[in-house]
Design a protein with these regions (language model features):
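Extracellular glycan-recognition modules
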Residues: 42-46, 55-59, 96-168, 188, ...
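Flexible glycan-contacting loops in extracellular carbohydrate-active proteins
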Residues: 215-235
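Low-complexity, glycine/proline/serine-rich flexible segments
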Residues: 68-116
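Localized edge beta-strand/strand-to-loop motifs within extracellular or lumenal beta-rich domains
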Residues: 190-204
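Surface-exposed, flexible coil segments in extracellular/virion-facing regions
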Residues: 1-9
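Short, aromatic/His-centered strand-loop micro-motif at the edge of beta-sheets
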Residues: 167-193
Length: 235
């Protein structure tokens, strides 16, 4: 496009390389800049947090979280260096199970997943080898917070001993899906991509594009719509 403020429509979600060329009226000075644009699917996406300088949800539901802090000098830094130069990520500062910061999402109808298929995808880098449980997300009520006293929650955490990762659909004690990764600790200080899938009573964990663990045919489990937390150190 040669327009001053062009509007470009993409028919398919994905990542596209774009080139911006700018010049003055006399064409005596020209600047060219290459970059990438990410186009999200407009259907079925619930949350999208790029964490590029802030905690805003860039998805269609605009579910913006608040920072909750336990202890002194705990916070979430949204200007930490990301895995690619020039980009930022969220750094969750923590010390122990009494001193950490995390994000809390406001209640929203879009978070009422119940037993519908859900995929959660994220990048994490950690070198913390001492925390007993290092949480990434937790959604739904535990037994002490639910009116019926039942677990109706899902969560993902790193552990310092085997199983090194647990992705769980927890319902009525241990009757849910406990998807355990036991191969090796992932607290190696490198970026890794994780995908958690819950569908038709089965759960799957993918690490860097490879299926690493699964828990099959456990039956459909409802998940409470609140609370929803991202990042925490506990226990």
């Amino acid at each position: 496009s040669n327009e001053q403020n062009p509007t470009v429509t993409y028919s398919t979600a994905g990542k596209y390389k774009v080139t911006l060329v700018a010049s003055n009226d006399m064409n005596t000075s020209t600047a060219e800049q290459e970059g990438y644009i990410t186009v999200l699917p407009g259907k079925d996406i619930v949350l999208f947090y790029p964490f590029e300088g802030d905690s805003k949800d860039m998805g269609p539901n605009a579910i913006h979280p608040e920072i909750l802090k336990l202890g002194d000098n705990m916070d979430v830094n949204f200007n930490a260096p990301a895995r690619k130069e020039g980009f930022t990520c969220a750094e969750f500062r923590s010390k122990d199970n009494q001193n950490y910061a995390f994000l809390s999402l406001p209640d929203n109808d879009a978070l009422d997943f119940q037993a519908t298929p859900v995929t959660t995808s994220f990048w994490v880098k950690t070198s913390n080898k001492t925390a007993a449980n290092l949480g990434v997300f937790q959604h739904g009520a535990g037994p002490n917070a639910s009116t019926d006293g039942k677990n109706k929650q899902t969560w993902f955490r790193f552990q310092k001993s085997s199983p090194f990762i647990r992705y769980v659909i927890e319902y009525s004690g241990l009757s849910g899906n406990w998807t355990d990764y036991k191969t090796k600790a992932m607290t190696d200080g490198e970026w890794h991509h994780y995908v958690c899938v819950h569908t038709n009573g089965s759960t799957y964990l993918y690490i860097d594009g490879v299926k690493a663990a699964e828990a099959l045919n456990k039956g459909l489990k409802p998940i409470d719509r609140k609370p929803y937390f991202i990042g925490a150190m506990y226990r």
